Amino acid sequence: MSEKINSKEDFINQYADKIWDRASLVNPETGRFYDEHIPILSALYHGIDRFIEAQDKYNTYQTALEEVKAGRKKTHWIWYIFPQMRGLGTSEMSKFYGINGRDEATQYINHPVLRDRLVEITEAVYNNDKTVYEIFGNDAIKVRSCMLLFASVCDIPIFKQFNYKYNWD
């Protein structure tokens, strides 16, 4: 029978050897994980639910949708509304909310709430009178990465249509 996991630290310690070589994760002098690995390990612990938690907190998804419909992103939610592959950004947020490969992207798009929300907000951007660049400014590159990712793992038409509209395919 497997050992009960009581905390995030227990989870990380139990699975560290399975995920990577423990020596590359842990500072031998302190016995603690190197700081750069904490967001990734934490994301693995939280799984796909980290997106739901972030989108639901403070009604953030609704705020994001309203901002997109109004034609301008004003607040900070891009990482968990339009996720992209891990490694494309360097911030703690991009590491924590980065998609860890095609399998996790498929899990994301197969989750009924996450799929419906991503399709809804993508359609809101697509149908807006303003361009993706006007709505998102410098964050348009994150939207591009998101659209390319999900167009590659599913057959939902809006992602391919979006990529075609902006010549991203």
Each model region followed by its residue ranges:
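Mid-chain, well-packed structural core segment of small domains
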Residues: 107-148
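Charged phosphate-binding loop/patch that engages nucleotide di/tri-phosphates or the phosphate backbone
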Residues: 41, 153-169
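Short, hydrophobic/amphipathic alpha-helical patches that form generic packing surfaces
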Residues: 80-83, 142-153
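Hydrophobic/aromatic-lined pockets within catalytic cores
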Residues: 69, 86, 126, 151-155
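Hydrophobic/aromatic-rich, well-ordered segments within soluble, folded domains that form packed cores
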Residues: 67-102
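Extreme N-terminal tail/first-helix region
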Residues: 5-19, 37-59
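Acidic, low-complexity, intrinsically disordered interaction modules
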Residues: 20-35
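A long, hydrophobic alpha-helical segment
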Residues: 55-69
